[in-house]
């Protein structure tokens, strides 16, 4: 599009621009219906193309906003040919994290978020809130490298600590600093949470949600091998091989003590481990207890192909409309030749006409894209 506009500008400088524009507006007046159909057809094609490409880009860049995303891995349990699961127990995760110096940091996240009811006190007045919270171990801030606006990557080290997304902090505390403020639970048996940090909101295409992250109790299921209820992520050193990390763990971990004397890694009725890079988790399917957003690479490839087919069809349509008008425009073109217009000027006017119609259709499609999210047709939950 930009190349076409640039080319037309160069051509126009060498041609009679006044004549070209006069011919262009004359065509619009004479063939109003055809011009409107051309513009609408192209603009709808542009809208469809851009909407599809936005979705494709959304999924292909999922979790790419995290620094060193390719060095972050989720550890899944594989049950032979029976499938796999995304959750793990805390002592197993602790043993894995400490098994190799190649693992820079590890963290656990509860498999599901929960709603928390709390209130804050300000000048003797109580204001109640209900917000989603995710119970995590302190290492989450270092594995995923939260962009901390207040506080640091050690903000969850102490019990009853929480970090808030910027949007939530502004909603609750306005322009005041949130650090040090208490979130008092509606449950009198639960200790108040203390805000220790504020992080910049994650983009929508991230597995991490813009919720309150609460520090997991150090005693919670610490040695409980029967509670498999956590997502487990590790961050490896730059250039480290995940296969080497897995082999090292399997060689040194006393699996028989944990799972029984008959346990063997990778056996049909036994367990195995799988490390999946953070961006690939989005495309990993058929994993039990995996509540993270999913997409299919095959579906995205189909969408990508459809987007370009739409553009090609729109181009063919545009050409057909222009060709259909040729018999009605022959007289006008011959008249211009008689009046002295050169072939170059006539070709230039046709080129300007095509580019102007395309440019106007493109601008109209941008207007449609601006309006669509404000209509009931837009899916607010997407």
PLM region descriptions:
Residues 21-37, 41, 314-357:
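Intracellular coupling helices
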Residues 39-53:
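Hydrophobic membrane-insertion alpha-helices, especially the h-region
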Residues 49-179, 186-194, 247, 259:
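Structured, solvent-exposed hinge/loop segments at the ends of secondary-structure elements
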Residues 28, 38, 59, 75, ...:
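Generic structural signal for small/hydrophobic residues in well-ordered secondary structure
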Residues 300-321:
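Selective detector of the "anchor" transmembrane alpha-helix that sits immediately C-terminal
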Residues 47, 274, 355-382:
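Small-residue-rich transmembrane alpha-helices
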Residues 1-5, 9, 134-150, 162-295:
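Mid-to-C-terminal secondary-structure elements
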Residues 2-9, 13, 17-21, 26-34, ...:
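Membrane-helix entry/capping segments
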